[in-house]
């Protein structure tokens, strides 16, 4: 599955301010869906380092008109609400969202597991540490000799929290949190050892799109034709186009490692590449040959 990202925030790192009006947000939703998104993931609070927490009422003002607009135009498209607040999740679900993407793994709002269980919605449990303001910084990126093992252990805590509240296991997906509470080496370790996360037995959700780790891969990897590759440019100077194309490569590798859900800013290149990569898996290739 490909989730198209729709940030309706004024301060997100990648596209903050681009879709703060309902009209602009709905135009972007149309674009994501027309390019092949299986779902739209709507976020009303930035998680960039140093971002200020947003009151629930302000977050709701940002996301609810967009949810209503998408639901009126696209009755069947799944809508995911990216929030750590139970009040926001509850209202979004009432307006037509069917998935809660909680980047705190349900650790920041004790009411979140119960709200999701009562609604019977699907949930994405992401690994992170700390608050919304610092979960994307390096402040909490302290690990021992097995960072992937620690990520898995903490994901298991989130899974237990969800299931204890009554969320059915078939409603749970897990996100190892690429770029959250992790230095570049930690995120790369998660990607390289992703099969260990897959072994948890839940669909694995990858949200690497345009992250700092993508920029670091570009900086240290020479790619012919990529103007900012193999340079000493600061990560923030590397273009969205280069980040998007590199994201496609990372996602294809993650697919072959067992990931099944991908959250991306640009849908079409990921849709094409992931569909082609899936067609070349042994099961699908055999069917194709027939």
Which residues does each predicted region cover?
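N-terminal glycine-rich anion-binding loops that anchor highly charged ligand groups
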Residues: 1-4, 31-44
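Pocket-edge structural micro-motifs
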Residues: 4-5, 208
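Short polar catalytic/cofactor-binding loops
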Residues: 7-11
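Active-site-adjacent loop and "lid" segments of alpha/beta metabolic enzymes
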Residues: 13-28, 47-72, 78, 83-87, ...
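Short acidic capping loops at alpha-helix termini that bridge into adjacent secondary structure
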Residues: 168-171
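Acidic helix/loop microenvironments that form the catalytic cleft of cell-wall polysaccharide enzymes
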Residues: 178
């Amino acid at each position: 599955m490909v989730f198209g990202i729709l940030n309706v925030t004024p301060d997100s790192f990648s596209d903050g301010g681009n879709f703060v009006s309902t009209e602009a947000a709905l135009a972007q939703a149309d674009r994501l869906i027309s390019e092949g998104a299986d779902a739209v993931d709507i976020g009303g609070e930035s998680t960039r380092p140093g971002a200020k927490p947003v009151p629930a009422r302000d977050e709701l003002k940002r996301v609810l008109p967009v949810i209503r607009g998408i639901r009126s135009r696209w009755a069947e498209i799944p809508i995911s609400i990216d929030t750590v607040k139970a009040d926001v999740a509850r209202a979004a679900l009432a307006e037509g969202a069917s998935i809660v993407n909680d980047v705190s793994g349900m650790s920041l709002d004790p009411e979140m597991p119960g709200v999701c269980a009562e609604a019977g919605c699907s949930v994405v449990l992401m690994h992170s540490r700390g608050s919304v303001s610092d979960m994307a910084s390096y402040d909490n990126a302290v690990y021992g000799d097995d960072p992937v093992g620690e990520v898995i252990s903490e994901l298991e805590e989130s899974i237990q929290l969800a299931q204890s509240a009554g969320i059915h296991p078939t409603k749970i997906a897990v996100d190892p949190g690429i770029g959250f509470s992790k230095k570049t080496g930690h995120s790369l370790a998660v990607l390289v050892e992703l099969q260990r996360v897959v072994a948890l037995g839940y669909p694995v959700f990858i949200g690497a799109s345009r992250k700092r780790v993508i920029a670091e891969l570009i900086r240290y990897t020479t790619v012919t034709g990529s103007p900012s590759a193999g340079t000493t440019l600061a990560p923030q100077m590397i273009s969205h186009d280069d980040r998007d194309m590199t994201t496609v490569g990372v996602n294809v590798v993650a697919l072959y490692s067992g990931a099944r859900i991908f959250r991306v800013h640009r849908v079409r290149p990921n849709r094409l590449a992931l569909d082609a990569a899936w067609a070349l898996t042994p099961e699908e290739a055999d069917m194709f040959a027939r």
